[in-house]
Amino acid sequence: MTIAFQLAVFALIAISFLLVIGVPVVLASPEGWSSNKNVVFSGASLWIGLVFLVGILNSFIS
C-alpha cells in the first residue's frame, strides 16, 4: 500500500509540473487553446483524480 501511495504522489507531482509548464504555453500560442483544449482538460481531470486518490490512499497509510 505504501508503494501505491508513493507512486500516486509522484504522479501527482509530475502532472502538476507538466500542467504548470504546459497550460501557459498552450494559452500563449496562437490557435493553441482551440487545438489543445482536450489535452488541457484531460490533464486537469487526471490531476483532480490523483488528488482524490492520494487523499484516499493517505487515509489507509496514516
Swiss-Prot record:
Q: Where in the cell is it found?
A: Plastid, Chloroplast thylakoid membrane
Q: Which UniProt keywords apply?
A: Chloroplast, Membrane, Photosynthesis, Photosystem II, Plastid, Reaction center, Thylakoid, Transmembrane, Transmembrane helix
Its record classes its membrane topology as: Multi-pass membrane protein
An example of a Gene Ontology cellular component annotation for this protein is: photosystem II reaction center
**What's an example GO BP annotation here?**
photosynthesis
InterPro entries reported in the protein's UniProt record: PSII_PsbZ, PSII_PsbZ_sf
Primary localisation category:
plastid
Q: Which Gene3D superfamilies match?
A: Photosystem II PsbZ, reaction centre
Q: How does it assemble?
A: PSII is composed of 1 copy each of membrane proteins PsbA, PsbB, PsbC, PsbD, PsbE, PsbF, PsbH, PsbI, PsbJ, PsbK, PsbL, PsbM, PsbT, PsbY, PsbZ, Psb30/Ycf12, at least 3 peripheral proteins of the oxygen-evolving complex and a large number of cofactors. It forms dimeric complexes.
Family statement: Belongs to the PsbZ family.
Q: What name has this protein been given in UniProt?
A: Photosystem II reaction center protein Z
Upper lineage: Eukaryota, Viridiplantae, Streptophyta, Embryophyta, Marchantiophyta
Q: What would be the name of the gene that encodes this protein?
A: psbZ
